[in-house]
Amino acid sequence: MDRSMRIAFLSEHASPVALLGGEDAGGQNVYVDEVSRNLARRGYAVDVFTRRTSPAEPEVINWAPGVRVVNLSAGPAEFRLKDELWPLMPAFRNAFLQFMLHDEVRYNLIHGNFWMSGWIAIELRRRLDIPVVQIFHAMGKTKRRHQGAVDTSPSERITVESEIIREVDRLIAQCPDEWSELVNDYGAAPDKVVVIPSAVNSHMFRPVPRDQARRYIGLDTNGPVIVYVGRMLPRKDVRNIVRAVALLAREASTTSARGTPLPPVTLLFVGGETSEPDPIATPEIGELQRLAAELGITERVRFAGKRQQEMLRYYYSAGDVAVTTPWYEPFGLTPLEAMACGRPVIGSAVGGITFTLMDGITGFLVPPRDPPSLADRLYQLLSQPALRERMGKAARARVEREFTWSTVAHRTDLLYRALLSPQLSPRLPSRILEMERKG
């Protein structure tokens, strides 16, 4: 395959290699991995530049056909939290330029991920005079608005984001909510912002029969199971789910409030820093254990620890319903993963979740920080098997129709071509995709 078009994918803290385990991996890692692979399948050569976090990491890894991961030295070769990396970005920029000289490689376009890589991208644009596409994955103003004093982002973040928005050639928003943030909060030119939603690997995340999935993961219950998969962070508000389950348990002995009581419900948490649930390594697990004990539902709450991506379909499928109720979520891949596994989702009506989850069709939207509302919707789904099945099928169909990585790569390819060959490309609308909010 002729790979004459070469892309520099910048992702300073989120390497696709992290998906193999050993360090925390989130949505940005998945995005970088899947988009680079799918762009390579379309004929691009993609080099993913990330920061070396261990002396044992080689400089270049042949990650997939047409994709290399380049580990650049910027500061000590050790893991650091992403909010501690900002002072190392000039060294990252310099290491990129040195790699170009040493490898004698030239790039047609730079694709920045996150605000720090965006800063590197515009620094390189000034030196190399090549176009830049930027995706933020999360915006500083929105994070500060929701997290307030507990926001650990560097003080320069919002100023740098504004500079990036002014200077790059195109901005990718993952949902209409993010498009509005870029245009209304930061003053981005509307025709510079393109909506290209992220996606899910619909082969890796596929339905497994419930009983088979429970046997596979060793979950010994025939009763209803609520599953949460994801990071154990305060902004994910997993404590909200514990409180909602406690409300259901409290009402289990009465028929006055909701009609027929539910059988005992199991709440399964999948995630954390280690494969075995460890409240020292993952403090939020300890908080959840204490809260469950305080509310008298310790025996109903189980922790699976961190699991590899290819195992997650069994955990989603073991559940009757998946729940994610963060009070802040830029996009959120876990609702799509659950939907791909044919499970209805109850999610907070925030950020990208309001875009991916179709209220009343693929699940339900609920207000954040509202355990009674969540308990109401949990009861509705857990007490109505036919409703669960109908919503689960609609969820899977929506993913197959709108949220595949090949579709993301196709839309990104259109964007690249419009920048690289404007005289040959059709005019690109400011929103590549206006997604149907109807089934």
Q: Which ranges hold each PLM region?
A:
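N-terminal subdomain of nucleotide-sugar transferases
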Residues: M1-V69, E436-G439
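Carbohydrate-associated surface elements
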Residues: D177, A199
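A short helix/loop element that forms part of the nucleotide-sugar donor recognition site in Leloir-type
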Residues: R206-L219
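Conserved donor-binding/catalytic core segment of Leloir-type glycosyltransferases
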Residues: D220-K236, V242-V245, L268
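Short alpha-helical donor nucleotide-sugar binding micro-motif in glycosyltransferases
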Residues: K306, Y314-G319
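Aromatic "clamp/platform" in nucleotide-sugar-dependent glycosyltransferases that forms part
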Residues: W327
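Short hydrophobic beta-strand element within catalytic cores of glycosyltransferases
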Residues: P344-G347, L357
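Conserved acidic donor-binding segment of nucleotide-sugar-dependent glycosyltransferases
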Residues: D359-G360, F364-P371, Q380-P385
